[in-house]
């Protein structure tokens, strides 16, 4: 009996959820100094990195041709689905932590730690790789003199390490980490300057492309491409067409456009850094959703315009995969424009680097504040109001990686952390919107201050009616003809269906990735399995759609629920399956290190665990409440609010201005 009780207690520790109360949304140790424009600049700068100067040429030449503009449109729509889920959580829970916090308040502590641990990895590798790219781009402007010097005098001949240590990248990371430690407002100002220069350069590229472009480059005939291939002595493709495709707007067909969209999806990664600023924004409930959606829109317009200008200036099959824009300008006779492009590329890399460094210490700070990482990492500088220990320590780790390692083999690990976070946030939105408690619990503030209250139909329900609905048992009738109000049974059903949906999507992704040849050959087993997966997917989504949602309103809510989050989960898991086996092995090693930290330290020092244990002790020994009051106040020193541990209630918008 005792081992079973211990196992049950251990399992409850893994799924305990963080309680975020209304008062704690304003309570922060950080400095609230960021505006909506600061968030837009941060999102655009982080997302619109150097990829806009390189990715368009690579995808247009190999996958999409001129239809790369459609590829970016599809990728933008897929990214917006994830962005909208982040936007709703940013409005509901405007606290530091991003996807880590959103997972913690919805599905529990273990999944939250997994999410946060992988976000840390993504930001560290992203910071290191962008710093080395910045160093390499600057070295190109100096005719590679820095690299030649370091290769001569500091060459490293060890497997897995870089060819030479990158001192320049180390200095760059430490400089920006120091800037962030100095203050968020100063960092935001520097970011806005670099982002503005980047946008101006991209506008120049678009205008120049449309002026010097030729629509004929979108209408190249197949015969012309065959002649080009024959003169270059290139063998034809398997279907008899040129290696450059069939010509026209979609030379590689719609499948090529979709393949390009999968690659372009990663060009929109980075907006999630906005969600880590919840405790540093003046009005986070409105600024975070606006910042996320606006930054994604601006980035799409930039990617769309640059890719259109590039393919109009130069035939897609002649594009240079590494430096498409400078080569394209030389092709149209504007050679000196390459210096403008180089300046824009350095500014883009600078904002991208700042966008990687900025959220990294904030996720670490949030996890340390909750007790899941070492408490010293939650220390806040009294003058600058920044997590100085987390900033400097994470910057030092990123600098060390940039100094020693060849990061090309590790970059794919960034994708796992990001895509997993996207998937979990979408799943959390589904689970949260069908919880029963959000409509019945009345916040301790007036409707006028609350801004958006519950609907009259819900608030007019008597307590006895609500209790009757909560006690309603499960049956097939409640599955297909549920009540008007969410119950605990309907919420549990949705939670189960969301989990089952994730495993179903995983199976569908594996089938369409590794069994695609069997599907194209119309083999019976593959078609039957594909049909089964699709039917179950549609049935589960429709069943979730039939369940009653809570009536609570916030500043921003994901539209088209549950279809949009479900499709976001499908896209993200499919892209995760595309990653190589070596990437998953490295990911497993990183997770093993994380689990060692969590099960040896985090699970025992969790703030939620201490507060729940204290609450249980008060229930068991009510006569000792006064004797334990002093200890309780010490534990709640960082909380400053009463807690309702029986409900995973997440408070809605509080429209006060900071």
Swiss-Prot record:
Phosphoserine: modified positions: 24, 446, 455, 464, 646-647
Q: Which UniProt keywords apply?
A: Amino-acid transport, Cell membrane, Glycoprotein, Membrane, Phosphoprotein, Transmembrane, Transmembrane helix, Transport
**Any one annotated GO CC term:** plasma membrane
Could you tell me which residue ranges are on the Extracellular side of the membrane? 60-63, 126-163, 214-248, 310-339, 408-410, 512-524, 579-582
According to the record, which residues are glycosylated? 157, 227, 239
Q: Name one GO molecular function term.
A: L-lysine transmembrane transporter activity
Question: What is this enzyme's catalytic activity, as reactions?
Answer: L-lysine(in) = L-lysine(out); L-ornithine(in) = L-ornithine(out)
What GO biological process, any one, is recorded here? Answer: L-arginine transmembrane transport
Residue span of the signal peptide, if any?
none
Transmembrane keyword on record: yes
Q: What is this protein called?
A: Cationic amino acid transporter 2
Organism name: Homo sapiens
Gene that encodes it: SLC7A2
């Amino acid at each position: 009996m005792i081992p079973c009780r211990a196992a049950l207690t251990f399992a409850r520790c893994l799924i305990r959820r963080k309680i975020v109360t209304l008062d704690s949304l304003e309570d922060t140790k950080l400095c609230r100094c960021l505006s909506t424009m600061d968030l837009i600049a941060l999102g655009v700068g982080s997302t619109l990195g150097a990829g806009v100067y390189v990715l368009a040429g690579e995808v247009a030449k190999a996958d999409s041709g001129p239809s790369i503009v459609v590829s970016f449109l599809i990728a933008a729509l897929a990214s917006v689905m994830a962005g909208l889920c982040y936007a709703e959580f940013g409005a509901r829970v405007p606290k530091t932590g991003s996807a880590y916090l959103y997972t913690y308040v919805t599905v529990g502590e273990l999944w939250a730690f997994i999410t946060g641990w992988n976000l840390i990895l993504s930001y560290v590798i992203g910071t290191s790789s962008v710093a080395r790219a910045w160093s390499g781009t600057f070295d190109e402007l100096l005719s590679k003199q820095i690299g030649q010097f370091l290769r001569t005098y500091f060459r490293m001949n060890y497997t897995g390490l870089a060819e030479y240590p990158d001192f320049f990248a180390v200095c760059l990371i430490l400089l920006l980490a120091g800037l962030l430690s100095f203050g968020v407002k100063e960092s935001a100002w520097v970011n806005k300057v670099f982002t503005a220069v980047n946008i101006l350069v991209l506008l120049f590229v678009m205008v120049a492309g449309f002026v010097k472009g030729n629509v004929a480059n979108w209408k190249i005939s197949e015969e012309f491409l065959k002649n080009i291939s024959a003169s270059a002595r290139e063998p034809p493709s398997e279907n008899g067409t040129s290696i450059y495709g069939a010509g026209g707007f979609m030379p590689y067909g719609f499948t090529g456009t979709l393949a390009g969209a999968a690659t372009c999806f990663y060009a929109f990664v980075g907006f999630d850094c906005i969600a880590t600023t919840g405790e540093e924004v003046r009005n986070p409930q409105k600024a975070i959703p606006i910042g996320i959606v606006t930054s994604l829109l601006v980035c799409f317009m930039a990617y769309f315009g640059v890719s259109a200008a590039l393919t109009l200036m130069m035939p897609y099959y002649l594009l240079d995969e590494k430096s498409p824009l400078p080569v394209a300008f030389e092709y149209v006779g504007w050679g000196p424009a390459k210096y403008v492009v180089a300046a824009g590329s350095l500014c883009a890399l600078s904002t991208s680097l700042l966008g990687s460094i900025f959220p990294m210490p904030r996720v670490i700070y949030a996890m340390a504040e909750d007790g899941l990482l070492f408490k010293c990492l939650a220390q806040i500088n009294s003058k600058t109001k920044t997590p100085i220990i987390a900033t400097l320590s994470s910057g030092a780790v990123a600098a060390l990686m940039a100094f020693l390692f060849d990061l090309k083999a590790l970059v794919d690990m960034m994708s796992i952390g990001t895509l997993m976070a996207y998937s979990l946030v979408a799943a959390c939105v589904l689970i949260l919107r069908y919880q029963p408690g959000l409509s019945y619990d009345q916040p301790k503030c007036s409707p006028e201050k609350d801004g958006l209250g519950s609907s009259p139909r819900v608030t007019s329900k008597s307590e006895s009616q609500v209790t009757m609905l909560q006690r309603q048992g499960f049956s097939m009738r409640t599955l297909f003809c549920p009540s008007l109000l969410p119950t605990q049974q309907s919420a549990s059903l949705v939670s189960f269906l969301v989990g089952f949906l994730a495993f179903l999507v995983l199976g569908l992704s594996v089938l369409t990735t590794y069994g695609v040849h069997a599907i194209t050959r119309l083999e019976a087993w593959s078609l039957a399995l594909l049909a089964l997966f699709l039917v179950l997917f549609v049935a589960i989504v429709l069943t979730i759609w039939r369940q009653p949602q809570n009536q609570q309103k916030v500043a921003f809510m994901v539209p088209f629920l549950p279809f949009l989050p479900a499709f976001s989960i499908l896209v993200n898991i499919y892209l995760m399956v595309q990653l190589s086996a070596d990437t998953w092995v490295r990911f497993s090693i990183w997770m093993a290190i994380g689990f060692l930290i969590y099960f040896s330290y985090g699970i025992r020092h969790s703030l939620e665990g201490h507060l729940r244990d204290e609450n249980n002790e008060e229930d068991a020994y009510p006569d000792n409440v006064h004797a334990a009051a002093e200890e309780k106040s010490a534990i709640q020193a960082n909380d400053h609010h009463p807690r309702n541990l029986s409900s995973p209630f997440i408070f809605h918008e509080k429209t006060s201005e900071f």
